Amino acid sequence: MLRSQTCGELRISDVNKEVTLCGWVARVRDKGGMIWVDLRDRYGMTQLILEEGKSSAELLETSRKLGREFVIRATGNVIERVAKNPKMPTGDIEVKITALTILNESKTPPFLIEDETDGGDETRMKYRYLDLRRDAVRKNLELRHKVSRETRTYLDANNFLEVETPVLIKSTPEGARDFVVPSRMNPGQFYALPQSPQTFKQLLMVAGFDRYFQIVKCFRDEDLRADRQPEFTQIDCEMSFVEQEDILNMFEGLVRHLFKTVKEFDLPEVPRMLFADAMKYYGSDKPDIRFGMKFVELTDIVQSQGFQVFDEANLVVGINAEGCAEYTRKEIDALTEFVKRPQVGAKGMVWVRYAADGTLKSSVDKFYSADDLKKIAERFNAKPGDLMLILSGNGNKVRGQLNDLRLEIGSRLGLRPKDKFAALWVIDFPLLEFGEEEQRWFAMHHPFTSPKDIDAFMKLPFDQLGSVNANAYDLVINGVEVGGGSIRIYDRTVQNKMFEVLGFTEEEAKAQFGFLLEAFEYGAPPHAGLAFGFDRLCSIFGGVDSIRDFIAFPKNNSGRDVMIDSPSVIDDKQLKELSIDVKVADKGRIGIPNIIEETFNVKRDTSKDDHNITAN
């Protein structure tokens, strides 16, 4: 070994020891008579010292050649520091150098390798190997490792087997486009990279592996939005001979284990909420329950008073911002402008102020008497000091707008701290949703989700299938969907019916999923599962919004790896071997002709998926 200790382990008890350290030079301070070198490695930082008149001339000369990020090997004696640094674990000691070797020099880095860096995102992504030297980034990857390790510990203790599933699979598009891989041995044919191991884990259940898991890379070729990655990681799980309650208990146990071991936080028992209630009271299928402000419907008591905006709305609904009656007009106007932003889309906002003296005043006093305002306040269960904020319009749309307002108010009031955690199971999703434009049914989750009432699903008329609920569940933490899954269909007749409802012909279903349908004829057990968004889970534990901070080598928001310049053009020889002709569609992009894009019959708002799970 080139070193005897790391740069993070020496303490006052090590004084008088001779040690050898290796690492990167963080900074050099030359005060003439004294030279200090801060040496950094993955484990921490240690201060090295040389002294004019006591250190050899050769050592002093070598030390004065050092620059930022030089790799060195230093041998010396541990001594007690005169000016201790309580902010450093090694701050009680320093190493008086007796030998110094430069193992490698370094160009001047393009940004400061410090917790507070001056490097922009693109620069840090281009030089990611330098960014990874920063303590903040290193800690994120250590946390990711810990989450991975503790996941395996819990699942192994519960008799789960970690089984790897194929990466080169058949293209069965699952809500987004597949990444396709040409087959040289089979000209004109393509593999796809998996968006999820969905069908393979179901086949493992058919094979008798009753408890499976995998921490697995998945891929989705979709239009990128902020904080999305074309490749992402799932904790993918499946169980046989279970009901929904068994799944919820098992994986609530996993999440509580992770909070305990990773965050040293005792997560309370996770409550359950019906999808219908989540939408009614929070306007979202992933409500943030760290704070209250449930929606209150007012339609029946505010219409027919001459206020046209309310009279023409099919829903009038609001929230009570407790203790906010002292908001200035400027602050209220700022909230009005917030809801009128294109991203929210409301036309305006009505407010009712319940002053500390008990009087009520609103932005629509012209239409509502004091008694009317009192009825509104009573409906909100408001008290003096509260501020009621009201939106109106189309039902589903206005609930979404009020959800945005609720979260904004919660953030402004400090009710959504990163170190506070509230988890929630959302259950009983609709099985299907009807696309008015396409005039057909789409699966709310995916086509392998079992109806809660199978008999009703099989017997109801086509136009009444919207009343059937799914045996599906999502885990939400702090308003972020971190995982989800379902009880699976395991009977071929039911699965065929699902494909039929979704608009598949018998031939299309057989071509895409014939292998699964056939497997169901060989004794498929009842089974269920879910997948957690591993990257998103790590970001929640780390208290940051970006999943990119927890991925060693992420892509940028354009799906590019600017460090290795990928994706890139491949040479003509490779294309010829693959029997592919390439047509340049526009600058910087290539198109492969004669590949028909197929759309999988899943309709879900993936713009609001936080962890890139398409099938789980």
Curated annotation (Swiss-Prot):
Residue ranges of the region described as Aspartate: 198-201
InterPro entries recorded: Aa-tRNA-synt_II (IPR004364), aa-tRNA-synth_II (IPR006195), aa-tRNA-synth_II/BPL/LPL (IPR045864), Asp-tRNA-ligase_1 (IPR004524), Asp-tRNA-ligase_1_N (IPR047089), Asp/Asn-tRNA-synth_IIb (IPR002312), AspRS_core (IPR047090), GAD-like_sf (IPR004115)
GO MF entry, a single one: nucleic acid binding
Binding residue positions for L-aspartate: E174, R220, H445, R488
First-listed, main subcellular location of the protein, grouped into a coarse class: cytoplasm
PROSITE patterns, A to Z: AA_TRNA_LIGASE_II (PS50862)
Keyword terms of this UniProt record: Aminoacyl-tRNA synthetase, ATP-binding, Cytoplasm, Ligase, Nucleotide-binding, Protein biosynthesis
Binding site for ATP: R220, D221, E222, Q229, E481, G533, F534, D535, R536
Record-level GO BP terms: aspartyl-tRNA aminoacylation
GO CC entries: cytoplasm
Reaction it catalyzes: tRNA(Asp) + L-aspartate + ATP = L-aspartyl-tRNA(Asp) + AMP + diphosphate
Quaternary organization: Homodimer.
Job description of the protein: Catalyzes the attachment of L-aspartate to tRNA(Asp) in a two-step reaction: L-aspartate is first activated by ATP to form Asp-AMP and then transferred to the acceptor end of tRNA(Asp).
Family as reported in the entry's similarity comment: Belongs to the class-II aminoacyl-tRNA synthetase family. Type 1 subfamily.
Protein name: Aspartate--tRNA ligase
